[in-house]
Amino acid sequence: MNKQKNNRERTPQPEQDTERDEQLTNSHENDIDSAPAAEENDKVADPVEELTAQLAALNDTHLRLMAEYDNYRKRTLKEKSELIRNGGEKVLVDLLPVIDDFERALSNLGDMSEPAAIKGGVELIYSKFMDYLQKQGVKKIETADLPFDADLCDAVAMIPAPSAEQKGKVIDCVKTGYTLNDKVIRHAHVVVGE
């Protein structure tokens, strides 16, 4: 009996052989499967890298567009505020000749022997009108006895200066200049001493 037992242990059983064969086959298949899996991982890694690069490019484009939009928004807000601030410039420029007429009328009324009531009425109208313009941001450019400033004045004539101190200074203002919110809307026409 012992002999039979030993023989059984020595002779491989068909079940054990089958299990060994399956293990060998499985390990061999795993080796074969692992090679394509490594190739697939490389292929999968490439799309991941591509998608990462695309994501970075899209983020960069997005940030640039956001910055561009922010600059556009700031620029349009500035333009709108400038338009609101100086929007009535055309209307006010067209009213400036009326001021000129008032000034001429006042200077001529002083020379005439007209009743004082007419002169007082014209002065009142002129005063109210100038107050209105001042509220709108319109100011006269002061030129009398000041050095000539080409940014504010146009020299229409040059005459010999009556004194040495008046050389290069404004002698007379032919047409008054005006600014709207510190922007020149009409240059003063002046006579300069030389």
Swiss-Prot record:
The organism's taxonomy opens as: Bacteria, Pseudomonadati, Bacteroidota, Bacteroidia, Bacteroidales
Q: What is this protein called?
A: Protein GrpE
Name the family: Belongs to the GrpE family.
Kindly give the InterPro entries that the UniProt entry links to this protein.
Answer: GrpE, GrpE_coiled_coil, GrpE_head
Q: Does the keyword Membrane apply?
A: no
Quaternary structure, from the entry? Homodimer.
An MF annotation (GO) of this entry: protein-folding chaperone binding
Q: Which gene encodes it?
A: grpE
Q: What does this protein do?
A: Participates actively in the response to hyperosmotic and heat shock by preventing the aggregation of stress-denatured proteins, in association with DnaK and GrpE. It is the nucleotide exchange factor for DnaK and may function as a thermosensor. Unfolded proteins bind initially to DnaJ; upon interaction with the DnaJ-bound protein, DnaK hydrolyzes its bound ATP, resulting in the formation of a stable complex. GrpE releases ADP from DnaK; ATP binding to DnaK triggers the release of the substrate protein, thus completing the reaction cycle.
Disulphides: none
Cellular-component GO terms for this entry: cytoplasm
Cellular compartment(s): Cytoplasm
